Amino acid sequence: MSFSVDVLANIAIELQRGIGHQDRFQRLITTLRQVLECDASALLRYDSRQFIPLAIDGLAKDVLGRRFALEGHPRLEAIARAGDVVRFPADSELPDPYDGLIPGQESLKVHACVGLPLFAGQNLIGALTLDGMQPDQFDVFSDEELRLIAALAAGALSNALLIEQLESQNMMPGDATPFEAVKQTQMIGLSPGMTQLKKEIEIVAASDLNVLISGETGTGKELVAKAIHEASPRAVNPLVYLNCAALPESVAESELFGHVKGAFTGAISNRSGKFEMADNGTLFLDEIGELSLALQAKLLRVLQYGDIQRVGDDRSLRVDVRVLAATNRDLREEVLAGRFRADLFHRLSVFPLSVPPLRERGDDVILLAGYFCEQCRLRLGLSRVVLSAGARNLLQHYRFPGNVRELEHAIHRAVVLSRATRNGDEVILEAQHFAFPEVTLPPPEAAAVPVVKQNLREATEAFQRETIRQALAQNHHNWAACARMLETDVANLHRLAKRLGMKD
């Protein structure tokens, strides 16, 4: 089999049709899955000896949240080292990273696997993986044809990464230096709320403004602070953390500003405070609403004038510190109640950010669950950790009052429980492994029983026609998008439409 000019042109067109990178990537692998007739495809970005999924088709949604470290995935490591097309034999002893992650085929292992490393010049930037359930599924395609596919994918990925780099540099102050060497914190989530938050982080990171991060307990406020620091010109300098809620009143001032020898009982030597440690860097004050009014006044002075005094010292020290503060309280109400200074609130909230609770993030819960499953797999030395359909359904309908932190603990506990009831190093998480209180799954909708006026085959075909028509209307008559919505293979959908008389 060989690719026609029309097929290659179609792939190139799909890469140009999307508005954003994510849309282009999704179109690419959906088209490839249709052209190559594979069961699953994935586009991965390479970063710091791990592959990060950018777009998937035919794989469980939680794959988008997983991070595939080369040390734990020998097939992906082989792809990264190869420099050319890699075909894994059906009897390969190397475990496939997607075993158990193809919906409806959780109990079966992938039999055919092809890996295409993607390069920008001599640098590895990603990989394209193609998987199938039949051992000889990709034998009809030559290496030369697959290299052509890899070149198209590499060009799209390289351009996207270059655009991201240029956009980041354009947001930097004119005298700032690039900070590509600093490892970026990964914030997992594709929901509208998280997408907006990431944009706001990118905007404010390039400035030197103070930021107030608000959100419920467990939403990931510290992760937001890390992301701001790592994307800022201060990234090469320290990010210093202080939990204000854990500060005893007797040592709080010393922790913030330091002390000199003999300043109080037990001060046996000079000691720098958090502000000095964070000089030229960033200070993250977690649970800022717990500070006493007296300390709030001293903190306000530092923000106003940029100098500090160690406890017991009359001299002032100049510091250059960016302050990021976080709270799970409504500080506006705290100001009205007289428990928080209004002037400090306005100083801190120059650029406020709000982290959405997990219950408002839709399918992000599945992506995060995949991320934590992969963490557990590596930590416990397991070959795979897979979420069953029942477990995914449960996670999507639980409200998670403890947010992301509660999800992380729930996944870890479920892995331990599942491992205890199974032999071997493969873990499948079922709904019963999660101990969520008061979880009510939505009941199936009751429907009126229609009067039967046609035989079963006619009724089935009528239902199929109407379902396909509605899906096409919702997806602007894009057959690939329609197939994704109906969770079926696009080639099978075309064949069904022809049989139903919907296509010539």
Curated annotation (Swiss-Prot):
Task: Name the domain of life.
Answer: Bacteria
Q: Which residues bind ATP?
A: 215-222, 278-287
Return the PROSITE patterns for the record.
SIGMA54_INTERACT_1 (PS00675), SIGMA54_INTERACT_2 (PS00676), SIGMA54_INTERACT_3 (PS00688), SIGMA54_INTERACT_4 (PS50045)
GO MF, any single term: DNA binding
InterPro entries recorded for this chain? AAA+_ATPase, GAF, GAF-like_dom_sf, Homeodomain-like_sf, NorR, P-loop_NTPase, Sigma_54_int, Sigma_54_int_dom_ATP-bd_1
Q: Which UniProt keywords apply?
A: ATP-binding, DNA-binding, Nucleotide-binding, Phosphoprotein, Transcription, Transcription regulation
**Pfam families, from UniProt?**
GAF (PF01590), Sigma54_activat (PF00158)
Residues with the modification 4-aspartylphosphate, per the entry, are: D57
Could you tell me the Gene Ontology terms of the biological process aspect for this record? phosphorelay signal transduction system
- Asked if the Swiss-Prot or TrEMBL record annotates the protein with the keyword DNA-binding, the reply is yes
Which sequence positions fall in the DNA-binding region? Answer: 479-498
* Pathway info: Nitrogen metabolism; nitric oxide reduction
Which residues belong to any copy of the Sigma-54 factor interaction domain?
187-416
Q: Does the keyword Phosphoprotein apply?
A: yes
Describe its function: Required for the expression of anaerobic nitric oxide (NO) reductase, acts as a transcriptional activator for at least the norVW operon. Activation also requires sigma-54.
The protein in question is named: Anaerobic nitric oxide reductase transcription regulator NorR
> What species does this protein belong to?
Escherichia coli (strain 55989 / EAEC)
The UniProt gene name for this protein comes to norR
